[in-house]
A protein has these predicted regions:
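Non-catalytic, mostly N-terminal accessory regions of nucleic-acid modification and defense proteins
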Residues: 1-206, 210-211
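Conserved S-adenosyl-L-methionine
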Residues: 193-236
Length: 236
């Protein structure tokens, strides 16, 4: 499959998720959940990929949160701006999403924890409000908690099913393409300009950097460590 065919296939999948899952929810209102979920997956996989650094003996998602010491968390947050525990990763939340009766509040707590992990650090201003438009308790998702959770689980599962490959340069391209595609299509269907969309500031930076062909230096600003070996690894 050529890169253009791969991109077209991915766009069809994403648009299907955006339309099939939302049900009666207005597409313009639902946009932040699709974009936010894609963003959540992106930062989770970026985070894990940096920690593992190609080492097959490390699987960050399978580590217990208890292995993260205050020193590791502090050092990582100082270095990379925020911290995310293994249990908070997209892959782990999605794995149990369908049977999780508190999914909406669990997601809200995770997003709040990611943002608050930067409190007191130089990155606080950049991280604050990162998930502000991803309101997991909004009635836009449904009138009951069950309805909200069902829709959130469907979005998580849909985004998890997207074939984005390993987290390398090509995947960064695909995430950027997905954002650009969704923004332009939502805007066109709502009769609005793309500039009216909320896009996480770091994704905006990502897309801008990608267009300037700066992939070799891109780290997205969201990385951490889960071992002394990772802590001592050079950063670029």
């Amino acid at each position: 499959m050529t890169s253009s065919q791969q991109r077209a296939a991915l766009q069809r999948q994403i648009w299907a998720i955006a339309n099939d899952v939302r049900g009666a929810v207005d597409g313009w209102d639902f946009k932040q959940y699709v974009l936010g979920t894609l963003f959540y997956r992106f930062i989770s996989e970026n985070f894990s990929s940096y920690i593992e650094a190609g080492d097959d003996s490390i699987n960050y998602a399978e580590l217990p949160d208890s292995v993260i010491t205050p020193e590791i968390k502090d050092d990582a947050t100082k270095t990379k701006g925020y911290f995310i525990y293994p249990s908070q990763l997209f892959v782990n939340v999605t794995k149990n999403a369908l049977g999780n009766e508190s999914l909406n509040t669990d997601l809200a707590a995770i997003f709040a924890a990611i943002e608050s992990s930067a409190n007191g650090y130089p990155s606080e201003g950049d991280i604050k409000g990162l998930f502000a438009d991803f309101d997991t308790t909004s009635n836009r998702l449904g009138n009951t908690v069950k309805d909200k959770n069902a829709r959130l689980a469907a979005v998580l599962k849909g985004v998890a099913g997207l074939d984005l490959g390993d987290f390398h340069g090509s995947q960064i391209d695909l995430f950027g393409d997905a954002y650009e595609f969704l923004i332009s299509n939502y805007a066109a269907n709502a009769g609005k300009s793309g500039g009216e969309f909320f896009t996480p500031q770091h994704v905006s930076k990502l897309i801008a950097q990608r267009q300037q062909n700066l992939r070799p230096r891109l780290r997205f600003g969201f990385v951490a460590v889960a071992s002394e070996k990772a802590l001592r690894r050079p950063h670029y």
